[in-house]
Amino acid sequence: MKKNQFLKESDVTAESVFFMTRRQVLKALGISAAALSLPHAAHADLLSWFKGNDRPPAPAGKPLEFSKPAAWQNDLPLTPADKVSGYNNFYEFGLDKADPAANAGSLKTDPWTLKISGEVAKPLTLDHDDLTRRFPLEERIYRMRCVEAWSMVVPWIGFPLHKLLALAEPTSNAKYVAFETIYAPEQMPGQQDRFIGGGLKYPYVEGLRLDEAMHPLTLMTVGVYGKALPPQNGAPVRLIVPWKYGFKGIKSIVSIKLTRERPPTTWNLAAPDEYGFYANVNPHVDHPRWSQATERFIGSGGILDVQRQPTLLFNGYAEQVASLYRGLDLRENF
C-alpha cells in the first residue's frame, strides 16, 4: 500500500456542509410518499443540491485503543465527525439522511452476538467485548463512495476480516461469504413499516466472494474517529469494502456465513437491473438513472459551489484489487 496515493485535498468534505433531508426535499418538490419506497438512489441528484442547519452532534462512543499503521494514514483533513454521523443511509431507521442519527438510539448494541458459521471447520461466536478486544484494532483512512454519486473520507477503526475468517478455518467448499444485519423491528422502525424502510425485505443481507472477503482492504469496522461506532453508523460492527459502493457496507452484523453458492443481497433483490452483486465503483458503468462518471464531494458551499471530480475505477484502489476481477466483464458483472 502506497501512502497517500488515493486522496487529495479536494476529496475531503468541508466543515460547514450538511444537506436537507431526503423527505423534506421530496415533499417540497411534490413527490409522493409512495415514491419514497423506490430504491434509495432514485432521488439522489435532487437531495445533493441542498443544505440545512439541523446538524446532529458528533458521535460520543467509548474511546478505543488502536494503532495507526503508516500505510493507512495521511496528513489530509478529514470529513468532520458530525457529517459522517449525521448524513447516513440506514433504512432500518428511515429514508432521510438525518433519520438514522435521530432514530438509531433505540438500537441496543450491548449485549451483542456475532456468529460465524457455514462452510467452516471451527464455527465461532463473538460477544460485544470480543469485537473490540479479540483482534488488534487499527485506524484506516478510506475513501467512501456512495452509489448515489457522493463521497466522504473517513478514519474507520477495525480489524481485517481475513483475521476473523482465518480463525473459523474456511473449508475447501467455501466460495462466498454471506452477511446479515440484526432483525429487531421493535428497535428498527424501518423493519416494521415498508414506507419508513423503503419497501426493502429485511433483515438486510449482503455478500462477497471469499477472495474479496479475504482481501487485506476489507475491514470489520467497530469504530470511527477514535471511538466506538454510533448506532447510525452501524454499531457495534459493520463491513467496509472501500473499492465497492457503500451499500455493500452492511451494518449491525449478527451473522457471517460461508457458503458454496452466491448469497442473495438486499439491493440486488430489490432492483437487480440497478444494483449488482459486485457493486464495484466503476466510472464506465452508469446506474440506469444517472451517470457514475463523476462524483459529488459534499462541499462547504451551496448549490452554486458544488464541485465534481472524475470517479476513480475501484474508488482509487485499482492497484490493490483489479487482479481479483481479471477476465471478468465488469459491465456484465456490475
UniProtKB/Swiss-Prot annotation:
InterPro entries: MsrP, OxRdtase_Mopterin-bd_dom, OxRdtase_Mopterin-bd_sf, TAT_signal. CDD domains: YedY_like_Moco. The lineage of its organism: Bacteria, Pseudomonadati, Pseudomonadota, Gammaproteobacteria, Enterobacterales. The gene is msrP. It is found in: Periplasm. It catalyses: L-methionyl-[protein] + a quinone + H2O = L-methionyl-(S)-S-oxide-[protein] + a quinol; L-methionyl-[protein] + a quinone + H2O = L-methionyl-(R)-S-oxide-[protein] + a quinol. Predicted to be exported by the Tat system. The position of the signal peptide cleavage has not been experimentally proven. Binds 1 Mo-molybdopterin (Mo-MPT) cofactor per subunit. Residues 1-44 form the signal peptide. Keywords: Metal-binding, Molybdenum, Oxidoreductase, Periplasm, Signal. Coiled coil: none annotated. Belongs to the MsrP family. Transmembrane segments: none annotated. This is Protein-methionine-sulfoxide reductase catalytic subunit MsrP. Heterodimer of a catalytic subunit (MsrP) and a heme-binding subunit (MsrQ). Its main location: periplasm. Its EC number is 1.8.5.-. GO terms for molecular function: metal ion binding; molybdopterin cofactor binding; oxidoreductase activity, acting on a sulfur group of donors, quinone or similar compound as acceptor. Its cofactor is Mo-molybdopterin. Part of the MsrPQ system that repairs oxidized periplasmic proteins containing methionine sulfoxide residues (Met-O), using respiratory chain electrons. Thus protects these proteins from oxidative-stress damage caused by reactive species of oxygen and chlorine generated by the host defense mechanisms. MsrPQ is essential for the maintenance of envelope integrity under bleach stress, rescuing a wide series of structurally unrelated periplasmic proteins from methionine oxidation, including the primary periplasmic chaperone SurA and the lipoprotein Pal. It comes from Escherichia coli (strain 55989 / EAEC). One of its GO terms (cellular component) is periplasmic space. Mo-molybdopterin binds at residues 88, 91-92, 146, 181, 233, 238, 249-251.
